[in-house]
């Protein structure tokens, strides 16, 4: 379980529980800061100490493995799980090459040290400055408040007013400092997932390509690197979307701190001073009080513990509440209550007159307060005019601008958007707007469509089903995700389901042109997740679930054909699978548990062997058994496949043998890489009987310019074995970790086809596995395949049998 979110509403209350939670965040920040320093220190030692390189790698890997991400909320997305486990994977990779001498690239410092140092100094350092300001303003406010509360009511009115203004000013400054500090510390807590991992990832990438002895390991690392980059980019997109919503919530909290109440919280809570009478006089004791209006229970927690004894909270059942007359007591802001558990009257003092009125209103006192209504943005309705507007927008977009780069991501002019909406939803002549004969551009149309959907009185996917949809997206059972969302879609009201089908069908059409507009299902999920789904309460906890809303929309886009083919056979949602005991135990993408790679030994198969292989193909070539002695080693050309050319779950075919090197390729930038990984290709690549059709060459991606020994053929079990999660072993038998004989396939994509390799005796393509039922699962399917094949045996050299 991670840290609970720090609600902005708690900044106003400044309760002991809030301070305790804030302390946990501060400890985590210090731990992260120390971790970054360790990584920087160990990375520098790795670059400078070439002679002690092996020991430096070991220390660095231990540092990475010792760190574990904490997170906000109760569940991680698949991408966040991959990021959380990434340091463990990095450490395993470094341990594999502990005994190998490697050369460090010249720009290693720029890849690792500078980004981490920048993050530590700018982000964490800025957070510490916010902390100092928060503590300083808090100390000044409470010191002034204590002096202020001891002022006699017999002072001059001008002096009292001046003191009140000063207290209000300090309270406002402290509240703003608290809001800024909470916002900053949560932002650093979330952003460190990619700001820390990305520099280490880039450093490892340069580390492995700098030495020819580690090229084989680098080839294994590439799919993981690309998949992790995809996870980082998705997490960054979710973070950007969440940050925008949290900034809006922060602004609303600044305007009206008391308007956002969390469900299940007390009616009112805050600090009160209680008058306690003793034999030697009267004293005022500070308590943190919570009042539940339904049960009329007042819980008082002392903040000043007496030495030698720890006092717990006291629960009182309220009888009545009445304001204390000003002339009857020397203190200000007082009111009296009576409780069943105590005899006599209990006198309480509030920090201000406004706060006293809030307490009396909650306790049904004699001075209720009437809040002025909060102006609310005009809401849209899901009616015939709305359907007409959505259809006209979709028709215009698909006709005029479906190939526009950054479609829906680029924002139009607010003035033009309001002008279009006011004209279309004019009560006098609704819908009387011609999109084609006007000066409306594509950005205005897309922004207007998003504005209409976001400002519906109830979101398209309804408040009622919001929690169930988010819960389905949080499940680590990939089949359950799709089944539950499929079932919940048909629980929507008729007009909501019709509108959702209209929109998702349009988004599918947009994604089919992702090569031109660069808008993949993941990108569309980030944009339309907060648009089609919205929590009923305005809280930080709800904002943290936006990333799961994005996943719901992404699944709807990727499985549109299946979901809207008809309702599921069982109208009820499938039974909820057992919840995650801890998100850390979820199996992430991994390369550290792949099969062991041995030195490659190849031979020229005889004609009989080739014929036998044709009739009995194996995933990676002919089984090495009862053959002639091995011949001279040959090297293998490893052309880099276009990311996304292989079906999810399909193993890469054996490579043709060649003595030539691959052509140099340039490293694509992150945005293009993520696009290629997510695009997956919507059109099948043409094939010919003798190899790829001219013009269907590979798109350039990051490559390694080396000659690599061809993998040694080994025995593989059936493809069906890859679907098993585990196999039963005798007690005491340890699991054997074996590396695969060939480079793992490139990261899977949405829908793609692999190019047919040239026909050669040594190359036999493997059988295709079934595509996973959830496209989200395709991101991690092939990484889990290698670790599940525990029953596969290693190949043997010809003549090794005894």
Curated annotation (Swiss-Prot):
Bias kind Polar residues: ranges: 751-768
GO biological process, any: regulation of synaptic transmission, glutamatergic
Tissue spec: High expression in brain, particularly in the cerebellum, hippocampus, thalamus, frontal lobes, sensory cortex. Found in the myelin sheaths of peripheral nerves, chromaffin cells within the adrenal medulla, and in extra-adrenal chromaffin cells associated with celiac ganglia.
Protein name: Oligophrenin-1
Domain Rho-GAP stretches: 380-564
Compartments where found: Postsynapse; Presynapse; Cell projection, Axon; Cell projection, Dendritic spine
Region annotation Disordered: where it falls in the sequence: 641-663, 682-802
UniProt KW Secreted keyword: no
Claim: Cytoplasm is one of the keywords in the record: yes
Assembly and oligomerization: Interacts with HOMER1. Interacts with AMPA receptor complexes. Interacts with SH3GL2 (endophilin-A1). Interacts (via C-terminus) with NR1D1.
PANTHER family xref list: OLIGOPHRENIN 1, OLIGOPHRENIN-1
A Pfam family that the UniProt record links to this protein: PH
Source species, domain of life: Eukaryota
Keywords annotated in UniProt: Cell projection, Cytoplasm, Endocytosis, GTPase activation, Neurogenesis, Synapse
Function of the protein: Stimulates GTP hydrolysis of members of the Rho family. Its action on RHOA activity and signaling is implicated in growth and stabilization of dendritic spines, and therefore in synaptic function, in hippocampal neurons. Critical for the stabilization of AMPA receptors at postsynaptic sites. Critical for the regulation of synaptic vesicle endocytosis at pre-synaptic terminals. Required for the localization of NR1D1 to dendrites, can suppress its repressor activity and protect it from proteasomal degradation.
A cellular-component GO term for this protein: glutamatergic synapse
Domain PH, first and last residues per copy: 265-368
Record site: Arginine finger: 409
Transmembrane segment boundaries: none
């Amino acid at each position: 379980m991670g840290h609970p979110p720090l609600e902005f509403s708690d900044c106003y209350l400044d309760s002991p529980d809030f301070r305790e939670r804030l302390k946990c965040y501060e400890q985590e920040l210090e731990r992260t800061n120390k971790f970054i320093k360790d990584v920087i220190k160990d990375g520098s030692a790795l670059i400078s100490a070439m002679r002690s390189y092996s020991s430096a790698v070991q220390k660095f890997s231990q540092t990475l493995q010792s760190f574990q991400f904490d997170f906000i909320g109760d569940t991680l997305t698949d991408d966040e799980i991959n990021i959380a486990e990434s340091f463990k994977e990095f450490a395993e990779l470094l341990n594999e090459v502990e005994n190998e001498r490697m050369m460090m690239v010249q720009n290693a410092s720029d890849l690792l040290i500078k980004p981490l140092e920048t993050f530590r100094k700018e982000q964490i350092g800025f957070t510490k400055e916010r902390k100092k300001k928060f503590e300083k303003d808090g100390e000044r406010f409470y010191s002034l408040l204590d002096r202020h509360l001891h002022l006699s009511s017999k002072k001059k009115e001008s002096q009292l007013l001046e003191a009140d203004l000063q207290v209000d000013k300090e309270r406002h400054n402290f509240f703003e400092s608290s809001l800024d500090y909470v916002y900053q510390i949560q932002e650093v807590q979330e952003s460190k997932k990619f700001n820390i991992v990305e520099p280490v990832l880039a450093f490892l990438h340069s580390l492995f390509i700098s030495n020819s002895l580690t090229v084989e390991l680098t080839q294994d690392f590439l799919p993981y690197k690309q998949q992790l980059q995809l996870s980082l980019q998705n997490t960054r997109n979710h973070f950007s979307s969440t940050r925008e919503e949290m900034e809006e919530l922060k602004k609303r909290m600044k305007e009206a701190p008391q308007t956002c109440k969390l469900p299940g919280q007390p009616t009112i809570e805050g600090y009160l001073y209680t008058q306690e009478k003793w034999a030697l006089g009267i004293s005022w004791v500070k308590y943190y009080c919570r009042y539940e209006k339904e049960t009329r229970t007042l819980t008082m927690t002392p903040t000043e513990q007496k030495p030698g004894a720890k006092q717990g909270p006291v629960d009182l059942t309220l009888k009545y509440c009445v304001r204390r007359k000003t002339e009857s007591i020397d203190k200000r802001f007082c009111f009296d209550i009576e409780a069943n558990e105590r005899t006599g009257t209990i006198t309480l003092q509030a920090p201000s007159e406004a706060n006293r009125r809030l307490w009396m209103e909650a306790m049904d006192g004699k001075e209720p307060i009437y809040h002025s209504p909060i102006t609310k943005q005009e809401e849209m309705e899901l009616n015939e005019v709305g359907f007409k507007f959505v259809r006209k927008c979709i028709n215009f977009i698909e006709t005029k601008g479906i190939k526009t780069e950054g479609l829906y991501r680029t924002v139009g002019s607010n003035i033009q958007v309001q002008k279009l909406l006011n004209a279309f939803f004019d009560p006098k002549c609704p819908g009387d707007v011609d999109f084609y004969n006007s000066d409306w551009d594509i950005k205005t149309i897309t922004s207007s469509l998003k504005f209409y959907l976001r400002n519906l009185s109830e979101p398209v996917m309804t408040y009622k089903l919001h929690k169930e949809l988010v819960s389905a997206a949080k499940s680590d059972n990939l089949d359950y995700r799709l089944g539950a969302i499929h079932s919940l879609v048909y629980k929507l009201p008729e007009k909501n389901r019709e509108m959702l089908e209209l929109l998702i069908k349009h988004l599918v059409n947009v994604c089919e042109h992702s090569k031109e507009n660069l808008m993949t299902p993941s990108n569309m999920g980030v944009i339309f997740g907060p648009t089609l789904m919205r929590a009923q309460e305005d809280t930080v906890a709800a904002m943290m679930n936006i990333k799961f809303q994005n996943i719901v929309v992404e699944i709807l886009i990727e499985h549109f054909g299946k979901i809207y083919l008809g309702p599921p056979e069982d109208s009820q949602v499938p039974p909820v699978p057992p919840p995650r005991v801890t998100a850390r135990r979820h199996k992430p993408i991994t390369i550290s548990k792949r099969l062991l790679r041995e030195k490659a030994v190849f031979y020229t198969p005889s004609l009989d062997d080739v014929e036998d292989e044709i009739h009995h193909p194996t995933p990676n070539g002919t089984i090495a058994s009862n053959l002639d002695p091995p011949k001279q080693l040959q090297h293998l050309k490893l052309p880099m496949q276009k990311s996304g050319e292989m079906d999810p779950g399909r193993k890469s075919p054996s490579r043709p043998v060649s003595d030539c090197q691959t052509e140099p390729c340039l490293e694509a930038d992150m945005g293009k890489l993520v696009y290629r990984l997510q695009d997956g290709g919507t059109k099948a690549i043409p094939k010919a009987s003798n190899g790829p059709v001219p013009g269907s060459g590979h798109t350039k991606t990051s490559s390694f310019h080396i000659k690599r020994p061809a993998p040694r053929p080994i025995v593989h079990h059936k493809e069906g074995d890859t679907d098993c999660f585990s196999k039963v072993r005798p007690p005491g038998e340890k699991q054997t970790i074996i590396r695969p004989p060939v480079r793992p396939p490139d990261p899977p994509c949405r829908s793609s086809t692999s190019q047919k390799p040239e026909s050669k005796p040594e190359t036999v393509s493997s059988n295709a596995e079934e595509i996973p039922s959830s496209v989200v699962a395709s991101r991690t399917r092939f990484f889990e395949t290698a670790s599940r094949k525990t029953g596969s045996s290693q190949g043997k050299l010809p003549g090794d049998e005894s």
